[in-house]
Amino acid sequence: MCRDVYVYGTDEAATPDSNPPVIESIYLNHSSFKEWQTVNPSPMLIASVTDDRAINLSTAGVGHQMTIYLDDGGKSYTDVSDFFTPFDDGRPGGTIAYPLDGISQGPHSLRLRVWDTAPNSAEATVYFNVADNVAPVIYDVYTDRNPVSESANFYISHDRPDQTITVTVEVFDLMGKPLWSSTETGRSDMFTTMPLTWDLTDSGGRRVNRGIYLYRATIKDESSGDETATASRKLAVTAQ
């Protein structure tokens, strides 16, 4: 059995592309990151990149793949495109969320280089410090609803994306009496913990009365020492 195979070249009538990609943002762990901020030894580099046509995600072309350089070439990471997620709205571009590991203490730089399919390239550099025992940061603590009548799911917004963290939530009455607590350890879902659910009962299994309660959330990054972060909020419980 025979088949015809057609091989096509480039379109000579196509408009040349001389516009490089745009790195719209680059930071470590959270968008609140500031230059030379101190981070944990296993931070995540996050960048938003766009192009007027298309970002090159191929790893076949030597020197034209997405690359991250640590300390201006002291070490390079060439599997960056595996951690690229396209924009949901169909724009030519997306988000890079690249997990790093084992960076030594002290000052460092990370330089990101991306290409489009022309190929044109763009670069951006982020400067930072690394230290052990860096406490995580809690940006928000909240429940899926407030007030609640049947159960409450607690969430914590933080700066430890894709890290193994221990989360504890404690509930108190307004006199400070502890009523309930729960602790879980697991992989964080980027910037938000998985929910811890309270069924509105105390440690003895009795449903709490309607009223206002205090809850305190604590997180600990298991890869970054014993430092913790804590935040508290109020929760209203109504009748069923």
Task: Tell where the protein language model's regions lie, with residue ranges.
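Short, conserved beta-strand segments of beta-strand-rich sandwich/propeller modules, principally
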Residues: 44, 107-111, 153, 166, ...
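Surface-exposed loop/turn motifs at beta-strand-loop junctions within extracellular Ig-like
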Residues: 51, 114-118, 173, 202, ...
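Short, surface-exposed loop/turn motifs with a glycine/proline- and acidic-biased composition
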Residues: 100, 104-105, 185-224
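Short, glycine-anchored, charge-dense loop/turn motifs used at functional sites
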Residues: 171-179, 213-215
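Long, low-complexity serine/threonine/glycine- and acidic-rich segments characteristic of extracellular
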Residues: 27-32, 46-132, 178, 186-191
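Glycine-centered coil/turn sites that cap beta-strands in beta-rich domains
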Residues: 134-173, 195, 223-225
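C-terminal tail/sorting-segment detector
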Residues: 124-127, 131-142, 151, 206, ...
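Short, compositionally biased P/S/T/A/G/V-rich stretches that sit at domain boundaries
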Residues: 8-43, 50, 131-147
